[in-house]
A protein has these predicted regions:
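Proteolytic maturation boundary segments
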Residues: 2-38, 224-292, 303-307, 369-373, ...
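M16 family metallopeptidases and their MPP-like homologs
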Residues: 39, 44-61, 67-69, 86-135, ...
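Active-site His/Glu-centered metal-binding helix of metallohydrolases
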Residues: 68-76, 302, 554
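Metal-associated gating/positioning segment near the N- to mid-region
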Residues: 75-83, 87
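Hydrophobic, small-residue-rich alpha-helical packing segments that form membrane-like cores
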Residues: 151, 167-177, 181-194, 199, ...
Length: 934
């Protein structure tokens, strides 16, 4: 029997379906209506993820309450019955959590979620967390003074979110979901409503909607479900059962156009335009079943194929996308591309043409097979990872099933079903689901960007109508295919000639007879998966001269040329079908690094592809020119907004140092193909190679794969040619305050603080600096967010730069309004000076050390940590292993307040502190639109 009330479902979805739920989950319901789900999942020892879901959101607001649901989410952290305002961050810190990272909350149209991540399963910690969640349910104080403080914080959050993409999305919703209440209920609210909300409105809204029958507790992790069940009852069954019935939700009524609908949102000075097409229809009411899940999967699969097709058939477009969303019983298929502003007519016709062609003709078998193979691979790998999966991932999937009102059959079971769906689907079934998804005659189109459209709606409709008179056809300029990689003999089979074991961390260090190094740890933390890092040469250390802008496209110039046997698209096909991720970068300044994650069986392919690239590395002129154009397009597309202002700050700090500062488009014009060749060809051909592998594979299998690939290359250098930077890192910007400007959103700004250190640092030193950055962040949070409310999310981070033993820095980033930015920059300098002169308390240091200690203990259960911190550079720099052993032996505990305060005095004094206010240049024309946004 259904427990639906109006538009609310107050029972589990599996109680209204023939689909069986995951039997491993303890499903419960208290007499007051509060539901809970507990899943024992000991895959990560001691880890527990817990969420309180409140099935209410911005859709419940009245016109006078806009933004209040989200505002209440904030107020939960600003004073409750058992936790005073300002105490919560310190409380979580002492428990090993950091506010903002492990404690998260967010509000949507129809629900609000509060989450806790426990790194240690301690009953006292769990009880404290439950007490906090219980306070959220009926113990938020809503003190007027705290409301006023948080009001400014929310205005700061609104300002930080309110960029080009957000405004364009809101405008498109008003076109696609015309008539639905959600178009006027954006969760963040409006400045006017946020400023008008009084205490009584908070109390009334919270009392009305935070009721136990709209609450669900979900916990997943290394727990005893029955014991946690008792704790849930202890803390939550005393919440009073509501005495009034739930009112019907006011979701509005979709206004369906008689034909194609369209609108535009004009934004000046951006150069480009985003074109979206959507088909919105009421969800078909059907009971959930295996077949309904298959249909939903096929619809999603078809849209993924559409996204792939957009990238292959519209050469002048970029960022092609397609997806499926559902709001309040309305399904929406959405597709989009980005084009130059002057190309909007060509772009909208092309987008419409691809959708209509697919509607009429369906997909090609080879496209379907290529995408099927990729998804099968990923589903199988995720399923193998399930036993060791982080509980937060599974917790989120249970919560999503509740908010979607679908049966949770089990994360792993769902992957098995997806595998069956993938094996069963065919061209006919995907084409049929695609046609059910799109109503071609009633589509809605939206354009956002720098477009000059008079009589916007009519002009767009006429453009579409004109395009629909032409025959529908497609031609590809890019190709994807299931291309079989065939390993070859690049040379004689390699042989291991040196080996060393490190029992403290179960590592094996080896060298092949061609001097290629191998570092290996066999780990079963991720069943069936391996992680690899291949470091080649000296990276920036091999760059003979400073060439600004070179780093922004040089690696692409190499990759875009392909190899002697394979074209780039063929290599891309291999990567997409056989690997979880693959990359080539200079994130480590002291090496060119190939990185990848894959199934154990695909290690041979990963190593083979890299060997292909290194066998006869060549930089072609055509690939260099393609990379230059890509860099120019990227800079043009990101030349508006704060990100460009931050690039300006980096250039200000490092004054033309191409390792850190960004080049300009003018810099690109003076970089020649020979500059790229002079930098890359020697290290890629002859340079030192250090391979680190961690994962679920045996040492013998790794050696066999290596011996036939990288171990078979011609002899490489025994040692690195350049083991140190050819010039020291210098901060050229003088200490003190500086204002920088960017072109973009006139209401947004950023403030950055920077404190460099130029001397040799031990491991203990670097940990102490990490602690210091944590205390700086807490001070910024207290003053700028909690006391003044002028910043939403101030951050501070220790930048280790491990490749530069005599350079590191602490950087703080603060979101701001343009008018407040100069004052906040001065506040950073004042806080810095105060810490340098007066020091930190023992409690502050202990609070910052707590999360580091707990997460460090957990880190050795992470293959990513083992690869990046333990193995990387293990033979090049043996002290890396010594540091790893020291961390395992709890070197963090040796960091004292005295050590941290010594660094505070050394780093944070006035002569070493830099602060910049990054503000928008004044100009007219941004965000011109005919639509008033909520």
């Amino acid at each position: 029997m259904s427990a639906a009330v109006g538009d609310w479902n107050l029972s589990w979805a599996h109680e209204r379906s023939r689909l069986p739920p995951d039997k491993r989950v303890l499903w419960g319901k208290m007499p007051n209506g509060l539901r809970y789900a507990i899943l024992e999942h000991p895959g990560v020892p001691d880890r527990v993820a817990m969420k309180l879901l409140v099935l209410t959101g911005s859709i419940e607001e009245t016109d006078e309450e806009l933004g209040i649901a989200h505002f209440i989410e904030h107020m939960a952290f600003n004073g409750t019955e058992h936790f005073k305002a300002g105490e919560l961050a310190s409380f979580f810190q002492l428990l090993g959590m950091e506010l903002g990272q492990d404690v998260n909350a967010f509000t949507t149209f129809d629900h609000t979620i509060y989450g806790l991540e426990f790194w240690e399963n301690d009953e006292a910690l769990i009880r404290k967390g439950l007490l906090f969640l219980r306070d959220i349910a009926d113990g938020i104080l809503f003190e007027a003074s705290e409301i006023d403080k948080e009001r400014n914080v929310i205005l700061s959050e609104l300002r930080s979110r309110d960029g080009l993409a957000y405004r364009a999305e809101v405008a498109s919703y008003q076109t696609f979901f015309k008539g639905l209440t959600l178009t006027k209920r954006m969760p963040i609210g409006t400045p006017q409503s946020i400023n008008s909300l009084k205490r009584n409105k908070f109390i009334n809204f919270h009392r009305k909607w935070y009721r136990p029958d709209l609450m669900v507790l979900v916990a997943v992790g290394d727990v005893d479900a029955l014991k946690l069940d008792v704790l849930f009852e202890e803390y939550f069954d005393t919440i009073k059962k509501p005495s009034t019935p739930l009112p019907k939700r006011n979701i509005g009524r979709l206004k369906t156009a008689r034909s194609v609908d369209a609108d535009a949102f004009r934004i000046s000075h951006v150069g480009s335009a985003t074109i979206r097409a959507a088909s919105v229809n009421p969800t078909r009411k059907r009971s959930e079943s295996f077949e309904s899940k298959r249909l939903a999967f096929n619809q999603k699969f078809g849209l993924e194929l559409l996204q792939q097709r957009l990238g292959e058939t519209i050469p002048f477009g970029s960022k092609g996308g397609a997806g499926f969303i559902n709001y309040f019983g309305h399904d929406a298929a959405v597709a989009s591309i980005e084009v130059g502003g002057k190309q909007w007519e060509e772009g909208i016709r092309a987008l419409d043409r691809v959708i209509r062609y697919t509607y009429n003709k369906g997909f090609e078998e080879k496209d379907l097979e290529f995408h099927r193979s990729r998804k099968l691979f990923r589903a199988q790998k995720l399923n193998s990872l399930y036993p060791k999966m982080d509980p937060s991932t599974i917790c989120e999937s249970i919560v999503k099933s509740i908010t979607d009102d679908t049966v949770f059959v089990g994360y792993d079971q769902n992957l098995l079903w997806e595998t069956k769906f993938l094996n069963d689907l065919n061209k006919k079934s995907i084409h049929r689901s695609f046609k059910e998804t799109w109503d071609i005659d009633h589509m809605a189109f939206h354009i956002a960007g720098e477009v000059n459209i008079e009589d916007g709606e009519d002009k767009i409709k006429k453009t579409i109508a004109k395009g629909r008179k032409d025959p529908v056809s497609l031609s590809k300029f890019q190709f994807q295919s299931d291309f079989e990689f065939e390993p070859t003999m690049w040379g004689k089979t390699g042989v291991v000639v040196d080996t060393k074991s490190v029992p403290e961390i179960d590592a094996h260090l080896m060298r092949f007879d061609n001097n290629v190094r191998l570092n290996f740890i066999e780990s079963h933390l991720e069943p069936g998966v391996v992680r690899v890092n291949v470091r080649i040469g000296g990276g920036f250390f091999d760059l003979k001269k400073n060439i600004p802008g070179l780093r922004e496209f040089a690696l692409q110039a190499f990759l875009y040329g392909g190899t002697n046997r394979y074209e780039p698209y063929q290599i891309s096909s291999i990567i997409n079908s056989a690997m979880i991720n693959f990359g080539f970068d200079l994130a480590d300044h002291d090496a060119f690094s190939f990185r990848g994650t894959m199934g154990s069986e695909a290690l041979e392919y990963f190593l083979g592809i890299i060997t292909e690239y290194l066998h006869k590395p060549t930089i072609y002129r055509f690939s260099y020119e393609s990379a230059i154009m890509g860099a120019v397009r990227y800079r043009m597309s990101s030349s508006i907004g704060i990100q460009d202002g931050y690039r300006e700050f980096q250039s200000y700090l490092f004054e033309g140092d191409g390792r850190f500062a960004w080049g300009t488009r003018n810099d690109y014009t003076v970089v020649s193909v020979n500059d790229v060749r002079d930098w890359l060809e020697d290290p890629l051909t002859h340079g030192y190679i250090d391979v680190s592998i961690v994962g679920d594979i045996t040492k013998e299998e790794v050696i066999e794969n290596m011996s036939q690939t990288l171990g078979a290359l011609k002899d490489r250098r025994l040692e690195k040619k350049n083991t140190a930077p050819n010039r020291e890192v210098k901060i050229m910007a003088p200490a003190g305050y500086r204002q920088l400007e960017f072109t973009g959103q006139e209401h947004q700004a950023m403030v950055v603080g920077y404190w460099p250190i130029n001397r040799y640092l031990t491991l203990q030193d670097r940990i102490a600096l990490q602690v210091l950055s944590g205390v700086i962040e807490r001070r910024l949070w207290e003053r700028l967010r909690e006391d003044l409310g002028v910043s939403y999310s101030p951050k501070a981070e220790f930048l280790s730069y491990r490749e530069y033993p005599e350079f590191a820095a602490i950087e703080a980033k603060i979101d701001s309004s343009p008018e407040h930015a100069p004052d906040l920059a001065q506040a950073i300098l004042e806080i810095s000076k105060d810490i340098a002169e007066n020091g930190l308390s023992d409690a502050e240091v202990a609070g910052a050390i707590g999360p580091i200690k707990i997460k460090t203990r957990q880190a050795f259960r992470s293959n990513e940590f083992l690869l990046d911190f333990v193995l990387k550079r293990a033979q090049e720099k043996p002290e890396t292993i010594e540091d790893a052993i020291a961390v395992k032996n709890d070197i963090v505990a040796t960091v004292t307040a005295e050590i941290v305060n010594a660094f505070a005095k050394e780093l944070l004094h006035t002569d070493n502190a830099r602060a910049a206010a990054i503000t928008p240049k004044p100009y007219i024309g941004l965000f011109q639109t005919d639509t008033d946004l909520p």
